Amino acid sequence: MSDKPIRLGDNRTGAGGQPLPFAPAMRAGDFVFISGQVAMREDGEIEPGGIESQTRRTMENLIAALALADCTLADVARIGVWLDDPRDFWTFNKVYASYFPEGGPARSTVRSQIMVDAKVEIDAIAYKPLSSD
């Protein structure tokens, strides 16, 4: 095995087909680092609607990025959340909790202006050993 991190997945494109200059996921040994996910649809546009629909799309994008490393939400050790509007916190939390019925991983949530017209961004660190030795 290489000592270098392994890039997982192809570069995605954003609005207008603009290439995004980062990997969706990187594996470094037994850890998998997921880039910040927003409510971007397959066409590169942000999911319309409020915090509920955007949180669902963002979580589904997170699940897809985890799958690149054969991981699931059960493998996630830490999540970082950025919310554009703190008034969305309770609604976001309700949708988010539905993805973790047994309780979620360690998490930080902050208010931040997001670089695209999204209401939420989520990144993650997962732990999944490459071998059972």
Roles of regions detected by a PLM:
Residues 1-60, 64-77, 83-133:
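N-terminal presequence-like segments and the immediate start of the first folded domain
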